């Protein structure tokens, strides 16, 4: 992928479900382009289809109509295995709940994507320690999730998303399960990482104040995505 190729591009994206003889369109012709280093927020009411959109853009679900391209490659042209490889190469994911494996340390959780990819264990540990240090958890490498605070667990999840050096991190309500103070810290961290690493961030959030801190803001309403 060269610098002029969008990290992610959606064109005329439609997601519809059958309801008897009718078709219910949850997304209606969504258009979106994400370039290298962008940081954008997507807001919308509960049930507006934000998570559905994120799943389509991340290659985790199939659109009814329209197209999604990751790093210039159309997802529709790939089988599931090829889509997985493309997704793992270019995208990282953060969710409202951290989904850390409780029996493993912070370092081991972050290293997991690299080990699955087949990297050398020594390289995995070094890279994971480096990214945990960057998110402010250097002294907590050997702690298991049960010994970490909610904010620290979410920092580990962010580090895990970043460890493969993705072009884009897709975050679905990443601070929705945190108290106000901790949420503000995690929000500031993502903005800082975007600025320092050049990693693009797409953040789905109900927090309009957080969204306002992102240079690009979109609202999903009635199946349509519009820039604010």
From Swiss-Prot:
SUPFAM superfamilies: P-loop containing nucleoside triphosphate hydrolases. The gene is lolD. Belongs to the ABC transporter superfamily. Lipoprotein translocase (TC 3.A.1.125) family. Its EC number is 7.6.2.-. This is Lipoprotein-releasing system ATP-binding protein LolD. The lineage of its organism: Bacteria, Pseudomonadati, Pseudomonadota, Gammaproteobacteria, Oceanospirillales. Residues 8-228 form the ABC transporter domain. GO terms for cellular component: plasma membrane. It is an enzyme of class 7 (translocase). The complex is composed of two ATP-binding proteins (LolD) and two transmembrane proteins (LolC and LolE). It comes from the Bacteria. It is found in: Cell inner membrane. Part of the ABC transporter complex LolCDE involved in the translocation of mature outer membrane-directed lipoproteins, from the inner membrane to the periplasmic chaperone, LolA. Responsible for the formation of the LolA-lipoprotein complex in an ATP-dependent manner. GO terms for molecular function: ATP binding; ATP hydrolysis activity. Gene3D superfamilies: P-loop containing nucleotide triphosphate hydrolases. It is a peripheral membrane protein. ATP binds at residues 44-51.
């Amino acid at each position: 992928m060269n610098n002029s190729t969008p990290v992610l591009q959606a064109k005329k994206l439609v997601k519809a479900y059958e309801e008897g003889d009718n078709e219910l369109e949850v997304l209606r012709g969504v258009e979106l382009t994400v370039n290298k280093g962008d940081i954008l927020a997507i807001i919308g009411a509960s049930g507006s289809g934000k998570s559905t959109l994120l799943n389509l853009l991340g290659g985790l679900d199939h659109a009814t109509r329209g197209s999604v391209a990751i790093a210039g490659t159309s997802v529709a042209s790939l089988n599931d295995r090829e889509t997985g490889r493309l997704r793992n190469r270019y995208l990282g994911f953060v969710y409202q709940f951290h989904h850390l494996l409780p029996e493993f340390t912070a370092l081991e959780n972050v290293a997991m994507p690299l080990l699955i990819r087949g990297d050398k264990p020594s390289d995995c540990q070094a890279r994971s320690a480096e990214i945990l240090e960057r998110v402010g958890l250097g002294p907590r490498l050997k702690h298991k999730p049960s010994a970490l605070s909610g904010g620290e667990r979410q920092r580990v999840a962010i580090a895990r998303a970043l460890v493969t050096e993705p072009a884009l991190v897709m975050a679905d309500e990443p601070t929705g399960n945190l108290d106000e103070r901790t949420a503000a810290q995690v929000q500031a961290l993502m903005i800082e990482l975007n600025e320092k690493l050049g990693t693009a961030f797409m953040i789905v959030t109900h927090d309009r104040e957080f969204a306002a801190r992102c240079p690009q803001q979109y609202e999903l309403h009635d199946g349509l995505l519009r820039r604010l």
